[in-house]
């Protein structure tokens, strides 16, 4: 939902009323429906992005339009059905991102004439449609907020790509700003620590180990200069210092690998399996790279990896929720946005 925070009116050189500032929260994406058709549309858009799959040659296109889009959508649809928000008929990521947008609008209501909206890089609501909506409402300045604490070309950069692609079709473009990654922001680290501590206090057991699981990516992308791995490590180290834990008690792993290439290691699922086989009975997993709970946290971690842990001898497993639209999570986003809006409001 678009939320407008009103103040006075002004006029642009073209004569239209344009004094508003747009803030667009952007997350990765979600299918419109939890079925094979919905997943096929979503995955085709996602996996056709050269920022996500860099080798977009003939071999990849044949594989994508052949085996992948004829098999993977059915499997992923079953996973989405396990976590689907049936009341609103949408994925949890969409529900949470909308809530983040609404709460941000309320939190910055005293800071001028701002329009807060939200979009998905893949799927709906699209960045194209929401940027058009913001400019139609008179926004001549636009702050794009990629909801990724750690930068990667496959996430933050493709948000920028799409924003400039949309602006490239406009004659009268809004002025554009993009928020930076916030992987080591003290407010973000503190919010993570408080969230973890509160969750652990609610459990009936004390985890022997906490695992910080981040979305993985091909090792080749890091070798080309992507800073993602270093930023994940920096987040984890800052969190260790904040919580007084060493690397044996707060472990860094990477999940969601896809395909046959080597991805960032250690792999989350393999580490979960090894810990259980080595005698660890109580494990908690936090996912600091996700600003909102989604398929990768609610199904892959909370269900798949919990089953791996128990199947191999583990007993107690808990997936720690993302910051989502919690007060501490929203405070991180609010401060980030207000910092980048300086001079505009």
Curated annotation (Swiss-Prot):
CDD domains listed in its UniProt record: Ferrochelatase_C, Ferrochelatase_N
EC numbers: 4.98.1.1
Keyword Cytoplasm: yes
Binding site for Fe cation: 215, 296
GO cellular component: cytoplasm
Catalytic activity: heme b + 2 H(+) = protoporphyrin IX + Fe(2+)
Example GO molecular function: metal ion binding
Keyword annotations: Cytoplasm, Heme biosynthesis, Iron, Lyase, Metal-binding, Porphyrin biosynthesis
Associated pathway: Porphyrin-containing compound metabolism; protoheme biosynthesis; protoheme from protoporphyrin-IX: step 1/1
Gene Ontology biological-process annotations: heme biosynthetic process
Biological function: Catalyzes the ferrous insertion into protoporphyrin IX.
NCBIfam families: hemH
Protein name: Ferrochelatase
Gene name in the database record: hemH
